[in-house]
Amino acid sequence: MASQLSYLQQELLRALLESGVTKEALKKALADGDNYAYPNVPLDDIRNLDEGDNCVQLPNGLGEPQMSEDESSDDGGDFTPPIMKELERLSPEEAAHQKAVVERLLQEDPWHVAKLVKSYLQQHNIPQREVVDTTGLNQSHLSQHLNKGTPMKTQKRAALYAWYVGKQREIARQFTHAGHSMITDDMSCDDVPNKKMRRNRFKWGPASQQILFQAYERQKNPSKEEREALVEECNRAECLQRGVSPSQAQGLGSNLVTEVRVYNWFANSGKEEAFRHKLAMDTYNGQQSSAQPLSTHDLPHGKTPRYTQDSSTDRSAAMANSQSTLSPSALEPSHILMNSDSKMVPVSGGSLPPVSTLTALHSLDHSQHTLGQTQNLIMASLPSVMTIGTDSALGPAFSNPGSSTLVIGLASQTQSVPVINSVGSSLTTLQSVQFSQQLHPSHQQPIVQQVQSHMAQSPFMATMAQLQSPHALYSHKPEVAQYTSAGFFPQTMVITDTSNLGTLTSLTPSKQVVSHHPTAHGDSPGSQLHNQDSSILHLHPSHRLSPIPTVSSASLIHYHNSSSPENHSHLLSPSHNTIDSFISTQMASSSQ
């Protein structure tokens, strides 16, 4: 039997059982339908209300309404609801009928009547705002009374019940005279002085929403014919919910379902679904970016990070942070500078010609290169930096298979280079060495040839040499040509780890101008290191770089060593006469 009852009927039956009526009493009342005539008598029929013989009082009803302490309010005892004054404008028969029904409801259990009123509002999709506008009750007080059974004064309950009775008559007339005016004579706007009634907004009922959700799962963009079929189905469900015939659908009034409303519902549902999807994706992407930050310790073995280039104005801020965010979406395959065994810390570069990496070299024992050894991870923001030195160039002189080496990078521009302090976990860059004057291009050619021949000894250095060409990666940029004739050795940066930091920080800078005489001649195209003083190391050109003298003088910053050079002979040595041998053996240092 329960399956044949509607949702509203099940709620009413449950309310009867909760009110104290037992199943046996309910069955007996249904069997004795003639004696219990009140539920079967329409509220607009006043024939049996005046007699009072056929009206059965509920067991927990109140014989004489009494106002409790909780029912006291600021309105006072002489509060008269506006709707009660409107009863005087009705005909004597209608006024007597409505007053009799209201008095009868006042004798019922307030909580039970409140449930009936709430069920009626839900059945006909009537908002509580309409009750508030008509009766003058407080919105919060009315909601608490209908939902929680909060006590309400007798005068206010009489106003609520008067509206309830009048609304029943109004809706009954709407379905009886479908297609006519939806406002009755006794409840018209003109009958309520100084009160502007608002038209009720359309509200989807639960029956119609269930039909539309099922249709949305089948087809998110229904055609006009499908929407019209849904209109008929929804109106039919709304009429059955109200207990009237589907042929009286025009009596739904403002709750009548139309094709335009169905179209708007599908459009709004699609927008809501798209918004929920976007919100879920944004939340997921935010969690992914916060849960997986890229750092030197998080980089997997065998992966090569790539870096992006910022503007020159942002280079200082990026270097101050010592690391910049690595954006996978902005990476370019042409920026892969290291092999699979190398790892770098990403640091943003400038908008200059090709930006290479200044990185420490691997030790001879590659098997000891693990993820925990992060001392050989570094990248510097230098334009056209060239890393010199390979595993084969280290030679057998380094018996300690450490993974840290001393690297000197050669820049192609005479400009201020930001210095990174404390990059990674144990690496530090020192002050860059500035050359105030550039070598003439005619001097550069022999040196470039020697460096290129040296770097071609291994695949890594060959790749570095190829990437150093400003036309290899930046052929589409017109401003590359202005950097091709720049000096080759204008700047040098020294990289080391914390084990060698104490030695290098003890060096103090000084300046000395060494003249290049045009009458000097030599056969070896290189430079020789001399130790003029036991505490000063400087570069002195003992051989001419080219037959044509074009450079008159150059300046070099020298570093004074506070300790004896014998203790740190692995840093610089005056025993090499050519730049080739100097590059291959002396531009690297193993951490002790």
Curated annotation (Swiss-Prot):
GO molecular function annotation = DNA-binding transcription factor activity, RNA polymerase II-specific; RNA polymerase II cis-regulatory region sequence-specific DNA binding
Region of interest called Interaction with DNA, as start-end residue ranges on this chain: 128-130, 141-147, 153-156, 201-204, 261-263, 268-271
UniProt subcellular location: Nucleus
Top-rank lineage group of the source organism: Eukaryota
Q: What is its main location?
A: nucleus
Bias kind Acidic residues: ranges: 67-77
State its role: Transcriptional activator that regulates the tissue specific expression of multiple genes, especially in pancreas and liver. Binds to the hepatocyte specific promoter element HP1. Binds to the inverted palindrome 5'-GTTAATNATTAAC-3'.
| Name of the protein described by the UniProt record | Hepatocyte nuclear factor 1-alpha-B
Organism, per UniProt? Xenopus laevis (African clawed frog)
